[in-house]
Amino acid sequence: LSEWGDKLLDFYNKNPEFVKPNSRFNEVVSFVEQGLKDLSISRTSFDWGIKVPGNENHVIYVWIDALTNYLTALGYPDVKSERYLNYWPANYHIVGKDILRFHAIYWPALLMAANLPLPNQIIAHGWWTVEKEKMSKSMGNVIDPNEMISKYGLDQFRFFLLREVPFGNDGDFSISSLVSRVNSDLANSFGNLVNRVFSMTNKNLDGLIPDAEITDKEKILIETCDEKISDYMVFFKNVEISKALESVSDIISSCLLYTSDAADESCSV
């Protein structure tokens, strides 16, 4: 491994989007810049596992075994297999921040040594706590996602998880924060906008949107929405889903203000 530090740094320099978020990438680069030591890829402390060829007293280190599963599950070493050709190199590896070093340093070095293509991007996510406490079975505070979905809805639960925590950060879960986020962003904002538009359309326009000239107010609204859509696309590409959804919330707020002004003026859209 010690011989691959410069090659890794060169790869990182040429592929600045390889690890997201950037703060995690900086940690990876800093670690490699300090100099890599050789990594033992076998263990003798237990006898279960894949035996090392030529020395059956050793078994392959479980992390080396685990990483190669990305390839062997696709048919490797048959690099002409349909699965391998369809799915490798992977577009994304989505991993916890605690195993980033294995995926962003050891794994690329192994692939380089084997003359195999590297995954396109590694996304490192944070951890969840529950009301500032670590999740554990002994404490009885493990969140069952099926229970959350059953009680609050699948889309609502997904929205909360994606919106509540900035990409790459650790997040803290509580029922109160889930309810607050869903009520505020989905029911009171998005739901209110949908209800207001349909109600005004049915009441004043017989449920049909007529042809009409675009006024300066509509032009401003369209420009605002276009800007936020552009922001959304940038954030989404960078896997900053929370910020992307914040852009959607900004669009909803602008539309709510527009419909409110329209109602005050003439109850027409």
Where are these regions (language model features)?
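Conserved small/polar residues in nucleotide/adenosyl-binding loops
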Residues: 258-265
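Generic hydrophobic alpha-helical segments
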Residues: 8, 28, 231-232, 255
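Structured secondary-structure scaffolds
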Residues: 1-203, 244-248
